[in-house]
Amino acid sequence: MSESLPRGEVEGPHAPRAAEPAPGDGTQLDPAAGPPPDSGLAIVSDSLPPVGVYGAPRPAVPQRLPLTPRFRGCGSGAGAGVGADAASPTGFRRLPDWLKVKLPGTGEYAGTKALLRRLRLHTVCEEARCPNLGHCWERGTATIMILGELCTRRCGFCAVAPGKPNGYVDWDEPRRVGEAVAEMGLRHTVITSVARDDLTDGGSTIFARVIGEIRRRSDTVIEVLIPDFRGHAQDLQRVIDARPEVINHNIETVARLHPVVRPSARYARSLDLLRQVKQSGAPIKVKSGIMLGLGEQQDEVMQTLRDLVAHGCELLTIGQYLRPTPQHLPVIEYVRPETFRWWGEQAHALGFESVASGPLVRSSFHADELAGTVRPGERSKTG
């Protein structure tokens, strides 16, 4: 393989931050009472009540941070988009044919988009610039992203906007997610989020409430793709207790590349999260995913797969890393489809129950088939 990426400095996890009140009328809320009905507002308090209510003064307005080149080898060309590459003067390189996808169409795509806009919901499909957006939305499916559109981390591979949410929580969001899932008639629902290190519970309370609101309105299978909650076991347990059918947490890359690819995460911490889900005894499938093309070596990928199996992972996705903008990590290699098929075979041999491996595979792509909700090729509704 090509030369691997340079090592970076390991950054410590973000400590919880108390947000400053926004300029306004100075109205103060009772922290013990939680957010007012229909306010959609909350802020981090010094201590989190058992039910996970944040409650306190009005929060500052969430602040989006600019994307700036953060990684050695990243270009600053005018172009941006899937497949951008520092080796090109414009920040792009030509994509191989197997990575080319058709543009979004109409019909179900337009209906899905209209529904999400009406209910003021974000999707990881849009925020992370997923290449499968057109395919999934035309099937009437989408992966809903909760807890806002600003992430408190700056991972080297991710297109989701970094920013300072300043403790903002939309308390009405769980209800709207429940309505969207019911209206779309989903049989398999995928919920994910940005990382919210500014919240004392990492956003786990909202995850639990979203699961509860979906349960009230639908008998859909619920899959959640969660952050690491900075290793806080009680926050993860809150999600486990809400009983989704699948908990997914992506390892993303091999151990050696974590300091560059996921500077605010830890390889061992992600493995521990998967182990905690498995050892909880809850009837929950454990899922993870890894990207190829960042400079990893074959033996490193194999060791990562072994580590995942050893920590209880049952479902696995393997996909190609595609550079979102010239400010993100460059693609070291475009892995061929036959190599992905080989990795899928290796993963099955190691003991994974179900594996999706291909250049365009993403965490929630055909998640229903991977989890066994429907048979491969059967027309389904998954989001």
What residue ranges belong to the model's regions?
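A secondary-structure boundary/capping signal
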Residues: 126, 146-147, 192, 225, ...
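Glycine-biased, low-complexity coil/linker segments
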Residues: 8-10
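Conserved functional loop/turn residues at catalytic and ligand-binding sites
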Residues: 150, 154, 159, 185, ...
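Auxiliary Fe-S-binding modules of radical SAM enzymes
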Residues: 1-3, 29-30, 34, 38-143, ...
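Core AdoMet radical
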Residues: 159-176, 181-274, 287, 291, ...
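Local cysteine-cluster metal-coordination motifs and their immediate loop/turn environment
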Residues: 124-136, 147-162
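Short connector loops/turns at beta-strand edges and beta->alpha or beta->beta junctions
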Residues: 149-152, 186, 252-254, 321-323
